[in-house]
A protein has these predicted regions:
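Terminal targeting signals and extreme-terminal segments of soluble enzymes
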Residues: 1-167
């Protein structure tokens, strides 16, 4: 006989705890104020506007380094979330404090398409190749209108290898 499905509240709590734990591992994410909107297995990064993010006060425009960091954060968290998803859904990842290591950036190329205005920004990453050792990601950022990107990037990442117990 099959086990009855878990209540949806339990599943949502487990997913939210895992995402919070994943984000909490990177202090710079907290400093920038980046959060993630989760819809099923899809994540959207949210960079709430703050005065400290302005790089050019004359325009004003979001600093290019902040834009780049936001895109890279969205890429790394999306890769990590995708790697966790199967364990999370099967219940194998019960403790929200034990996560695999994060992917390491090999290279990251940003295209600045227009100035980031002094308002909230959003980003979504798409994994274009995911292997055991290497992954490629394309990420896009927008503000008011998703069809008007202000930046996009392509990144290549070294995927973490499973830890081997030597007992």
């Amino acid at each position: 006989m099959r086990k009855p499905p878990e209540p949806v509240e339990v599943i949502k709590q487990r997913r939210d705890a895992a995402l919070t734990g994943l984000i909490g591992r990177v202090p710079y994410i907290r400093y920038l104020g980046v959060t993630f909107d989760r819809r099923g297995d899809e994540l959207t990064g949210v960079l709430p506007f703050a005065e400290k993010l302005i790089g050019n006060p004359i325009l004003p425009a979001i600093h290019g380094g902040v834009t780049s960091a936001f895109l890279e954060i969205t890429s790394v968290i999306t890769l990590s979330w995708t790697n966790l998803w199967d364990d999370l859904e099967s219940g194998a990842l019960e403790d929200a404090t034990t996560f695999p290591r994060m992917p390491k950036t090999i290279d990251f190329t940003v295209d600045y398409l227009r100035s980031g205005l002094p308002r909230d920004a959003y980003a979504r990453a798409r994994i274009t190749r995911a292997g055991r050792r290497y992954a490629s990601v394309h990420v896009e950022a927008w503000q008011d209108n998703q069809s008007k990107l202000f930046a996009q990037a392509t990144g290549h990442f070294l995927m973490p290898q499973p830890r081997v117990d030597t007992k």
